Design a protein with these regions (language model features):
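Active-site-adjacent structural elements that line small-molecule/cofactor binding pockets in enzymes
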Residues: 1-278
Length: 278
């Protein structure tokens, strides 16, 4: 289990003055939406215009392990995002839904942020992406994000109003491109698992990747066997120029914000190397 996103965001916001911080993501079934709105509003009030929130289904295996996986994840997420946005906007909320019930609540004027933070949907399946296009301010795509996946996701989102698209990717930069590929390779061991098929389906090597995973005893063997060309497609990795080119391709495809996740044995050194891309 990873660390708590809101606590980490609060720490980073308190230690900085300019950078924008995104929380990605809050599982809808894990928090009462009214209390989540109170916590988020506090962050947005203390650090105006510097916080964005993504809400999603959460990892199914994690949510099931604590008895929190709903019968209809789509219904819960629709209700949750809609009501969270209303609460953060200072509206009086009445709702008696399948999963969320609120009987006349609004944030007190002393607690409401001057500007409501954006609420994105962190999703990957076709129905969930369509949901995001209807109710969210944007979509957060988990890694790996390729230009082909971006185009397919936008087709399914079908936004009819301004809609942000945030893309996560594993990243490593080195003057030796092969060294960068070696660093990101272990972090790609999950992409052969079923939950990541929506990311891989638009790629020309999808069938070959599925076959490779079926022949490997486990994720580590699979990651070790990935061809270098596939690794280049599944991460932002290589020389600074190659990384910049990859990011340009993602922005051209429709990404509005790119989030790079450093990997390796020393994250601070990795961050310094990523700075060469900027």
């Amino acid at each position: 289990v990873s660390g708590g996103g809101l606590v980490q965001a609060a720490t980073v916001l308190a230690a900085t003055t300019r950078i924008r911080v995104g929380v990605g993501l809050l599982p809808a079934a894990a928090r009462n939406v009214a209390f989540a709105a109170m916590e988020i509003a506090s962050l947005a009030q203390l650090h105006p215009h510097r916080i964005d929130i993504a809400v999603g289904h959460g990892m199914p295996s994690w949510m099931r392990s604590v008895g929190a996986w709903p019968k209809s994840p789509l219904t819960l997420l629709t209700e949750y995002i809609t009501l969270l946005k209303s609460l953060l906007s200072g509206k009086l909320v009445h709702h008696d839904g399948r999963y969320v019930r609120i009987d006349g609540m609004r944030l007190h004027e002393s607690a409401a942020p001057a500007a409501a933070p954006a609420v994105l949907a962190g999703v990957r399946g076709p129905k969930s992406l369509a949901l995001s296009g209807h109710v969210a301010d944007g979509t957060l795509l988990a890694e790996p994000v390729t230009p082909a996946y971006v185009r397919e996701a936008l087709r399914q989102i079908a936004p009819t109003r301004p809609h942000r698209l945030v893309a996560y990717n594993i990243a490593a930069v080195d003057d030796d491109a092969s060294a960068a590929l070696a660093v990101v390779r272990p972090a790609l061991e999950v992409v052969g698992e079923m939950d990541w098929r929506p990311h891989i389906a638009p790629l020309p090597f999808h069938d070959d990747l599925v076959t490779l995973r079926s022949r490997c005893d486990g994720p580590q063997e699979f990651a070790h066997a990935l061809p270098d060309e596939w690794v280049r497609q599944l991460a932002v990795a290589g020389t600074p120029q190659q990384a910049r080119s990859r990011l340009a391709d993602l922005f051209d495809a429709g990404v509005t914000s790119a989030v790079l996740t450093p990997v390796g044995t020393d994250y601070l050194v990795s961050l310094d190397s990523l700075a060469a891309v900027l």
